Amino acid sequence: MKQKHFLISLAVLATGISVGAQTKDNVKTTFQTSREWKPSIDNRADAVMVYGVGGNPSDKSRKLSFEDRVKSWKERGYIIHFMTGIAWGEYQDYFTGQWDGKWHLDEGQVTQAGDTIWHGHMVPYIVPSENFLSYLKERHVKRVIDAGVDAIFMEEPEFWARAGYSESFKKEWKKYYGFDWRPQHESPENTYLSSKLKYYLYYRALNEVFTFAKEYGKSKGMDVKCYVPTHSLVNYSQWQIVSPEASLASLPCVDGYIAQVWTGTSREPNFFDGRKRERVFETAYLEYGSMESMTAPTGRKMFFLTDPIEDWPRDWADYKKNYQATFTAQLLYPNIADYEVMPWPERIYEGLYRTSANSDKKERIPRFYSTQMQVMINALNRMPLTDNKLTGSEGFSVLMANSLMFQRFPTHNGYEDPQLANFYGQALPLLKRGVPVKTVHIENLGYKEALADTKVLLMTYANMKPLESEAHSHIADWVKKGGVLIYSGTDNDPFQNVREWWNTNGHNYTTPSAHLFEQMGLPARPEQGEYSYGKGTVCIVRTDPKDYVLHEGGDKDFLYLAARMYEQNAKAGKLYSIGKDSSVMLH
């Protein structure tokens, strides 16, 4: 009976939501596969992303040529797109010298121990050199466009935080900084510099490849669209991976993203009320939210991904439960209505997985699950775009920055941020009590829409740093007009003192927050308390947000403060979710 009710609810969602603006093109649903068409993997989406000129390196089946795979799907009425990896892929001809007569396995990402980080056999994660980018453009992008494909998806621009020791990375360091490479484990400064370079290398890679794709397509009379399928900033930060993320939205050659959120990313444990555990629904909600807020002010297209299984082998009951959790989370963003309905249907429909957690017996997908899954996918095919809002006390936003990824590994001076607790410490206390907390990207504050729906902004510099000073002007202006800022932080993590704009070129601030506070007429290091600025309010709490979730009951004072600021200062209404009198004094 529960399953029946779940399916009926989906049908109501698909047909009953008021329709707002429509999507800009006719691709609403898509999926990725390295296989040719066959009935068992035909899921009736609008488009298919045919994976890899040489296929998917993890797929060991006999592969048809790229052109034959394209033809097989096109004959069945599918719109054809292309997907491949930008950091890894079926590129053995490059690594083994078939491209230019030179071996390039030394261009893999390497750890301090001297080990290459592999995605698979002969498939290293790449330090994207100019030579590799030339190879991608000539051997892959040209061939795809020549086959008539006018949409290219370059997925997962990923540089592992624990990497940064290869000769190829050292060469890129010298070119970028003008001085010799420095080991990232030796100081926070070196870690920060290393992360900024990793960030830049994949920004450059996507910019070059996509710009080439558009220019080459134009020479063929084609308007080529370019997209970045990427994990969320939440997940990359937690998994200790550096990626360009929000900065890509500023590139004119990037037309949109796929939010790669699924059970595998969302089951990463986090802390709440002193307990570390999986919280798949809550994490998925925040992951999708960070992707939505990353592109919302820019107007770029966004596909939301869900996966009925995951990369790690588990059992069908586990897959189904967590698929439903992530699927539900994506529907809580009604302003997004384009979807990648699944990756790799060949492994979903044809793979063998355990029948239960306590059994070694393996079977293909149960009929009841495949039927439910197809109903869910068909609902997405008809899901309208809407400007509907969630119920609940809206107006809380957590500030994020790409530099969240810069402070994750290695750690220094004994400062730890376990499981990204400084982020979750601001979000989970509210979310777990039914408050639909959102995220805002500091890189987007220049867009007036970025803070338009925010009543109370939650921020810290314990886990990130502002890469540009302009963000502080935008925050100060927003507060002056009536916004409420709650700043939580001791400002004593080891990255406060890295050489950056706040302590160079005429600036002499000991912390980035000192510059922010100065914009609002406060001293460089104000005491904990409540301050007025213009029509708005600044609350400073001298506690790192991780302490709100690492300890049982650690969020009590934070919740009372958030409720009081929301109700009394922001005048945003009653925060019913907290459920207690929210009068509390800051001392």
Q: Where are these predicted regions, by residue range?
A:
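The substrate-binding groove and active-site-proximal loops of carbohydrate-active enzymes
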Residues: M49-S61, I117-Y135, S187-A205, T230-S232, ...
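Active-site-adjacent "subsite" loops/lids of carbohydrate-active enzymes
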Residues: F82-A147, W181-Y199, N207
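Aromatic-lined carbohydrate-recognition surfaces of secreted/lumenal glycan-active proteins
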Residues: D25-T33, H81-G85, F153-P157, Y192-I241, ...
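Bacterial Sec-dependent N-terminal signal peptides
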Residues: M1-T23
